Amino acid sequence: MPRVVPDQRSKFENEEFFRKLSRECEIKYTGFRDRPHEERQARFQNACRDGRSEIAFVATGTNLSLQFFPASWQGEQRQTPSREYVDLEREAGKVYLKAPMILNGVCVIWKGWIDLQRLDGMGCLEFDEERAQQEDALAQQAFEEARRRTREFEDRDRSHREEMEVRVSQLLAVTGKKTTRP
């Protein structure tokens, strides 16, 4: 089953959902809302160091659970995200984040920053051309494999039917009955 839609770029550029989120807009950290602010700050920083966080686009209410690792990372082993994905050093009091993902069948990268005190900031989605091409190639391979297997099945089925028809004809010839084909 393909993980992406056939024309990802078109969907990203034309769908209202993506158009809204591709403009830089206000975001907020949404984790542990029931906890005191100081605890939320500490939990947010720890989550970033672990390579994950929950954010929301304020204007649309869209919530995302982000992972700050390269798209190829499978999560088999625990690792710390690189500075490319979680940058606590670029600007004092802020963390810059990057999270690749497939969202609604489209390869995107969420990019943004969050103020470490207020736990809000700015972020947006960008189309991930490189990953889109990789996923398109995988989808095409899966399609071709399914087509090949269907052809093989149809060939085996046709061969089996022909073999059965020959056997039935031979059996009828031995018993002396005539066969009428529909």
Swiss-Prot record:
The record marks E165, V166 as: Breakpoint for translocation to form CBF-beta-MYH11 oncogene in AML, subtype M4EO. Changing E54K: Abolished ability to promote ubiquitination and degradation of APOBEC3F following interaction with HIV-1 Vif. Does not affect ability to promote ubiquitination and degradation of APOBEC3G following interaction with HIV-1 Vif. GO terms for molecular function: sequence-specific DNA binding; transcription coactivator activity. GO terms for biological process: cell maturation; definitive hemopoiesis; lymphocyte differentiation; myeloid cell differentiation; negative regulation of CD4-positive, alpha-beta T cell differentiation; negative regulation of transcription by RNA polymerase II; osteoblast differentiation; positive regulation of CD8-positive, alpha-beta T cell differentiation. It is found in: Nucleus. Its main location: nucleus. Keywords: Chromosomal rearrangement, Disease variant, Dwarfism, Nucleus, Phosphoprotein, Proto-oncogene. It comes from the Eukaryota. InterPro entries: CBF_beta, CBF_bsu_sf. One of its GO terms (cellular component) is membrane. It is linked to A chromosomal aberration involving CBFB is associated with acute myeloid leukemia of M4EO subtype. Pericentric inversion inv(16)(p13;q22). The inversion produces a fusion protein that consists of the 165 N-terminal residues of CBF-beta (PEPB2) with the tail region of MYH11. Cleidocranial dysplasia 2: A form of cleidocranial dysplasia, a rare skeletal disorder with significant clinical variability, even within families. Patients typically present with delayed closure of cranial sutures and fontanels with multiple Wormian bones, retarded ossification of the skull, shortening of the distal phalanges, dental anomalies including supernumerary teeth and eruption failure, clavicular hypoplasia or aplasia, wide pubic symphysis, vertebral anomalies, and short stature. Forms the heterodimeric complex core-binding factor (CBF) with RUNX family proteins (RUNX1, RUNX2, and RUNX3). RUNX members modulate the transcription of their target genes through recognizing the core consensus binding sequence 5'-TGTGGT-3', or very rarely, 5'-TGCGGT-3', within their regulatory regions via their runt domain, while CBFB is a non-DNA-binding regulatory subunit that allosterically enhances the sequence-specific DNA-binding capacity of RUNX. Heterodimer with RUNX1, RUNX2 and RUNX3. Interacts with COPRS. Found in a complex with PRMT5 and RUNX1. Belongs to the CBF-beta family. This is Core-binding factor subunit beta. It comes from Homo sapiens (Human). The gene is CBFB.
